[in-house]
Structures are given as C-alpha cells and as structure tokens.
C-alpha cells in the first residue's frame, strides 16, 4: 500500500510522485505548480530537441492522468495557462482546487495519510496478502520501527 502527502509545495516532478501512490493527500495550504517540460541554459533549437521535449511531456501527462482523476484536458489547461506565473506558463493550485480537479484524492494532513495507510495495510492483511508488511505494521504501531 502507498500513500502520498503534499505538505508544502509539490512542484514540477513532485506531481507525478504525488499521484503515483494508491491514495494521495494534500494539506489545504499546500500548493502544486503545474507547468510544461522546459530547460534552462543554451539549447540548440532543432526539431529533434523539440520532438524530444514533446515526447517527455506526453509521457508525464499520460502518467499523471492515468494515476489520478484529472482529465487530460484540465491538466493541459493548467499546464499551458498564461497570466498566473510572471515569466512562465503554468498554474499554481492549492489544496482544495487540487482535490476538486481530481489531481489529488483528498485534503488532509499527516494524521489522515497515516490512518489511511494503516487501514490499507489492515485490509491487505485481512485478505491474505502481505504478511511481512503486516509484521512491520505491527512493529511500527508498537514503536519498534
């Protein structure tokens, strides 16, 4: 079982990391910056370079939309928005909006994330899976880990 929690800022590659868990949480005051793939410094402006970045962006978009409940259209809209970030494109979303858009599963904090993880472990144990996980869970609950 996996649970993620965004407490401060889940920017850039933090978004795919957050949605990769089975359940994701975000604190109400936490933010996430959604923007397209880009680079800094000197880049040769060739069609090959452009195509490379386009392929990377497609992979990231596919991963995020397949591992969350946000639509491809909404994610792309956030990513390509102008007017929010002074010198760039993208969108900053905060806790409630991240949940309402389907990017993150629930609002919550550390307690909520740990309680959910504990319930997931218990459920896995009851269905016969993960004996080693359950032993580690019992040790964690009793303060041995």
At which residue positions do the language-model features occur?
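N-terminal organellar transit peptides
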Residues: 1-15, 20-145
């Amino acid at each position: 079982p996996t649970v993620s929690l965004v407490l401060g800022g889940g920017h850039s590659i933090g978004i795919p990391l957050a949605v990769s868990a089975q359940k994701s949480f975000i604190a109400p005051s936490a933010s996430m910056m959604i923007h397209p793939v880009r680079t800094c410094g000197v880049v040769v402006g060739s069609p090959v370079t452009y195509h490379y970045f386009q392929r990377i962006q497609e992979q990231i978009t596919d991963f995020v939309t397949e591992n969350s409940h946000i639509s491809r259209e909404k994610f792309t809209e956030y990513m390509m928005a102008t007017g929010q970030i002074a010198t760039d494109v993208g969108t900053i979303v905060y806790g409630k909006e991240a949940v309402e858009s389907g990017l993150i599963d629930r609002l919550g904090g550390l307690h909520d994330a740990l309680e959910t993880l504990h319930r997931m472990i218990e459920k896995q144990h009851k269905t016969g899976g993960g004996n080693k996980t359950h032993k580690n869970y019992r040790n964690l609950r009793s303060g041995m880990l």
